[in-house]
Amino acid sequence: SKYVGSWKNDKKDGKGTLTWNDGSKYDGEWKNDVRDGKGTFEYANGDKYVGDWKDDMQHGKGIYFFHTGDRYEGSYVQGERTGEGIYYHASGNKYVGSFKDGKQEGHGTFTWASGAVYEGNWKDNQRDGYGTYKWNVGDSYEGEWKDNKFNGQGTLIQTDGTKYKGGFVNGMEEGSGIQEDKNGNRYEGFFKQGKKHGPFVETDKNGKVIRKGTYKMGRLEN
């Protein structure tokens, strides 16, 4: 490696540039032989970081340019994306929110290039907790999430006016729920893997019972 810059007590201190044998390069501030202050690091693979350093680690605010075209702007703690930031994907997707140890964690908004948007809780890069998802076509889901899927209690509203409120397991209606169409007709019953399953009551918009019976995996039994 090769260093060009200022020294203090035989240690790199002040401004200087260090070039490693693999081609990576740091240009910026040093303190007591380590990167500390403002600086730019160019990685051998083409990635680049511009921002704050402390104790030889990215720490504070910075911008990281990935050679893939992705970009991160935001907070760093001890070398990891931690705190508030924005991650721009080369694909056009974008995440604005909280990070922990390089992953989307806490509260954040993810916008897909398609126009779909999720706003809510994240854990370990996955939609987890409470959140709202809006499809680009206008459908929306608000409720509980686990492992990137609807899991728990939620409300699903479709553009045709159909509204479902109830339980979900792995992205599908499951357990007890109420489904209402745009005319106010209401189905109250149970679901399994997204299909009507079990005893139900159907009422019109005035609450008058239209039908009672039992479904078995989406098929009316009686």
Model-based region annotation:
Residues 1-222:
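Glycine/tyrosine- and acidic-biased, solvent-exposed loop/turn segments at the edges of beta-strands
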